[in-house]
Amino acid sequence: MTIIVDIIGREILDSRGNPTVEVDVHLENGIVGRAFVPSGASKGAHEAVELRDGGIRYQGKGVERAVAAVNGEILEELVGRDARNQIAIDQAMIALDGTPNKARLGANAILGVSLAVAKAAAESLCLPLYRYIGGTQAHVLPTPMMNIINGGVHADNSIDFQEFMIIPVGASTLKEAVRYGAEIFHMLKKRLKDAGHNTNVGDEGGFAPQFKSAEQAIDFIMESIITCGYKPGEQIALGLDCASTEFYKNGSYFYKGEGKCRNTQEQVDYLAQLVKTYPIITIEDGMAEDDWEGWKLLTDSIGKQCQLVGDDLFVTNSARLRDGIKMGAANSILIKMNQIGTLSETLDAVETAHRASYRAIISHRSGETEDSFIADLAVATNCGQIKTGSLARSDRLAKYNQLIRIEEMLGAQACYAGNWHC
């Protein structure tokens, strides 16, 4: 009944208007699982390969080659297989690709099929996706890390850091956390507008004002939190995604917005000072992806008081994560499914992190779709944290709304992660 009988890939558009892959997996019982593949703007050099067409069509960003792989080789390989055998299906696609980074068929082709297979299997068994993936123990609603000011490659402004996040650690439920975030988001908009700043939003729904420094952005957020009646640090904590690889060149960190250049030790000291000054409990990619020495210095400096998240550093890759664990670099990993390319490898990265007492944070990408898969994945893995953008743009809100539904479905079993930093 759960045998795969057809797979259909197609080219659609993501939240930035760029092509991406959508996949339908048809089962013998008539069930169809549909999945969409996200895409990032700031990509780590060690990520699995997202196959693009090149040429003039869509300015080279078309995905017809990836779609052809879905409708051709992958279809031929998987027809007749049982959708419930997720690991075997993922391994078959990895073997079919035959490269270490999924460069031949494309991680965007392989991931689309992998996720659609899981959705089809879950529906066939009449199970919510989070329950199918996570089993009976899946019950933790993640604390959202809400990106309300965008910078870096996510926005057309001069802020060097990519994301400034609010984290509703003091909420009692996921639904309440979303309310906290929405209220602060709208207050921030008012304060920015009153100060004469642009209130257009960036790729992830956060505002993108012309600030010259990280401190200026943080101060506006702090004022908005207080004006809403919340207590910084107690009810609302802060988080940063520095995306440092984007401004790391020749061993130094070049802050164009500030007109400053910091060496590795100065970068560590700067981040440590920010943590001392503000209620910052998490910093993502504080050091560049290949600055392993810097990561070790940063972890030794503030790793006991602040969550240090490796995104470009680890790229959801268990092997790179194990290297980081051995070195004592970072203490957490960001989980982005398209960085590695299959659901089973994603789950393996989460398990690897948890076994080493590293935290795992489920994350969206800047180029998203209406697919809410990561909301279910966050609950399935009991990770306790999710990054899925601001409180604007339907591609971001689709995930928050799905989490609200899941919390309702779980009823008394639901547990909001809240202040995981305690």
Swiss-Prot record:
Compartment annotation: Cytoplasm; Secreted; Cell surface
Q: Pathway, per UniProt?
A: Carbohydrate degradation; glycolysis; pyruvate from D-glyceraldehyde 3-phosphate: step 4/5
What UniProt keywords apply to this chain's record, in alphabetical order?
Cytoplasm, Glycolysis, Lyase, Magnesium, Metal-binding, Secreted
Q: Could you tell me one molecular function GO term of this UniProt entry?
A: magnesium ion binding
| CDD domains xrefs | enolase
User: EC number(s) of the enzyme?
Assistant: 4.2.1.11
Cofactor names: Mg(2+)
| Gene3D superfamilies, A to Z | Enolase-like C-terminal domain, Enolase-like, N-terminal domain
Q: Which InterPro entries match?
A: Enolase, Enolase-like_C_sf, Enolase-like_N, Enolase_C, Enolase_CS, Enolase_N
Question: Where are the annotated coiled coils located?
Answer: none
Q: Where is the active site?
A: E204 (proton donor), K336 (proton acceptor)
Annotated residues for binding of (2R)-2-phosphoglycerate = Q162, K336, R365, S366, K387
Where Mg(2+) binds, per the record, is at D241, E284, D311
What is any one of the record's Gene Ontology cellular component terms? extracellular region
Please give the SMART domains that the UniProt record associates with this protein. Answer: Enolase_C, Enolase_N
How, per the record, is the cofactor bound?
Binds a second Mg(2+) ion via substrate during catalysis.
What is one process in the GO biological process aspect for this record?
A: glycolytic process
- Keyword check for Metal-binding, yes or no: yes
Family per similarity comment: Belongs to the enolase family.
Stored PANTHER family: ENOLASE
Enumerate the HAMAP family for this protein: Enolase
Annotated function: Catalyzes the reversible conversion of 2-phosphoglycerate (2-PG) into phosphoenolpyruvate (PEP). It is essential for the degradation of carbohydrates via glycolysis.
Query: Protein name, please?
Result: Enolase
